[in-house]
Curated annotation (Swiss-Prot):
This is Cytochrome b. Heme b b566 binds at residues 97, 196. The cytochrome bc1 complex contains 11 subunits: 3 respiratory subunits (MT-CYB, CYC1 and UQCRFS1), 2 core proteins (UQCRC1 and UQCRC2) and 6 low-molecular weight proteins (UQCRH/QCR6, UQCRB/QCR7, UQCRQ/QCR8, UQCR10/QCR9, UQCR11/QCR10 and a cleavage product of UQCRFS1). This cytochrome bc1 complex then forms a dimer. CDD domains: cytochrome_b_C, Cytochrome_b_N. Belongs to the cytochrome b family. One of its GO terms (biological process) is mitochondrial electron transport, ubiquinol to cytochrome c. SUPFAM superfamilies: a domain/subunit of cytochrome bc1 complex (Ubiquinol-cytochrome c reductase), Transmembrane di-heme cytochromes. It comes from Dasyurus albopunctatus. It is found in: Mitochondrion inner membrane.
Amino acid sequence: MINMRKTHPLLKIINHSFIDLPAPSNISAWWNFGSLLGVCLIIQILTGLFLAMHYTSDTLTAFSSVAHICRDVNHGWLLRNLHANGASMFFMCLFLHVGRGIYYGSYLYKETWNIGVILLLTVMATAFVGYVLPWGQMSFWGATVITNLLSAIPYIGTTLAEWIWGGFAVDKATLTRFFAFHFILPFIIMALAIVHLLFLHETGSNNPSGINPDSDKIPFHPYYTIKDALGFMLLLLMLLLLALFSPDLLGDPDNFSPANPLNTPPHIKPEWYFLFAYAILRSIPNKLGGVLALLASILILLIIPLLHTANQRSMMFRPISQTLFWILTANLITLTWIGGQPVEQPFIIIGQLASMLYFTLILILMPLAGLFENYMLKPKW
């Protein structure tokens, strides 16, 4: 008798995706982040659902409803800390996942990559609207500054910004709709993640060497289920350490003050995971130029497959490209640091140089390195 998991219409899908899936035998821990992102999403949806049961999306009560959750709801403090720090873990895994894709040439699976970039944008949108909900000072002013960027769009900008706000400024209507967006978007992310996996399973996983692994595949279960389980344990350990020992480490002290439209905080800045893009936005002294640079800093990921010039897929055997990749990583860390600093010298010039280097590396230096490595590998006799 054939095993039920191979015949049942529903179990068959799960079987082909997580049990009898042929996987390359040499994929490293860098391939763990996809499943870790799935776990992060589930944690965020569950903690978010329970928080939504007690939260009120009204300007008068939003801030105190969050305080009420932390003080009066059973384990409400834990739910809130897990949800807030879960977002940080989510982005940590996202950045490592994207970095892995760039390093090992996974972006050559174009459909999977493009859906992944759409997923990244959707998660960023979700995190942004979610940060507004506690209605603290940084929530309010962050929402004001970022939504106000829409007004830089020629002709329709102001109308568009007021349409998003539901009035002439960030107010009750804005908070209510942001809560609605924040509730619906994770389910859209879940659907997109399924499509992401669907496209991935059309081709199978890439591997560190970048060489076609068809000749050496192993079943996903038990080999990679146990490996993923180890990843889950480490992720949960890190999340619990963060949420239980220093829950406010990555937050902004200004958000402990209720939103006040009459009092602007001295330094408006987003959460740490947006600082690199915020630094690029601020490095251009023109409003529209800054908005375009901000968009380009993320959308540039879509053209990375077109900029692949090397004969080899992975960077594993390409030392020049490797060096440029790690310079890019250091550059992004520099941008993250600059995004959190006040707008004054020397931070302005460092931010401008780092922003310029970011685009130069991706658009010019890395494709040139690929061509040079091709030339170096050609037999000279």
